């Protein structure tokens, strides 16, 4: 743990207080360290046989306030969202390709952002669908707190948008770690 290593070297009270605050962010710092060294571990996650439905997703998207600001917001291209929903539930040889709910959720967010399945609003729709997905599977909250806060959701969505597709697996692992 990064904060504990630094703590051994510091003696004064102010430094120890600062490290106490930094210690509250040890999970984030450890994730950054693992990301830098490409040693992120994919958490096991949860299983579920429930499935989100394409029509339910479209219903939620149609009610987004962003629809009022643009004539092209949420116009779907070639039923791309339906294809993504099919992709996250793919099986091979009787086993789910994406094993856990968290892995499905992470890929759902990633694919909506990267595949640009809407004329306008891909990032906003992706973030909304991610929240819906987490809530649908009862993993949006842990111990009464959001597992992904507003800033983290915006940051993850933008990170995906700006990322190189070659980085997909490490980004998926990072998102899954946020959810665990």
Language-model region placement:
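FIC/Doc superfamily catalytic core
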Residues: 1-180
């Amino acid at each position: 743990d990064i904060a504990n290593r630094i703590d051994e070297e510091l003696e004064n009270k102010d430094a120890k207080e600062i490290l106490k605050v930094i210690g509250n962010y040890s999970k984030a710092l450890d994730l950054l360290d693992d990301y830098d060294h490409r040693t992120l571990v994919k958490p096991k996650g949860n299983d579920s046989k429930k499935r989100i439905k394409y029509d339910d997703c479209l219903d939620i998207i149609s009610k987004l306030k962003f629809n009022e600001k643009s004539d092209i917001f949420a116009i779907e291209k070639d039923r791309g969202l339906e294809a993504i929903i099919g992709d996250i539930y793919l099986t091979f040889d009787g086993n789910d390709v994406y094993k856990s709910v968290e892995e499905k959720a992470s890929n759902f967010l990633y694919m909506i952002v990267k595949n640009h399945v809407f004329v306008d609003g891909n990032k906003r729709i992706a973030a909304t669908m991610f929240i819906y997905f987490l809530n649908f599977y009862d993993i949006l909250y842990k111990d009464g707190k959001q597992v992904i806060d507003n800033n983290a959701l915006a940051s993850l969505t933008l990170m995906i948008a700006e990322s190189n597709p070659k980085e997909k697996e490490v980004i998926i692992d990072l998102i899954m770690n946020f959810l665990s």
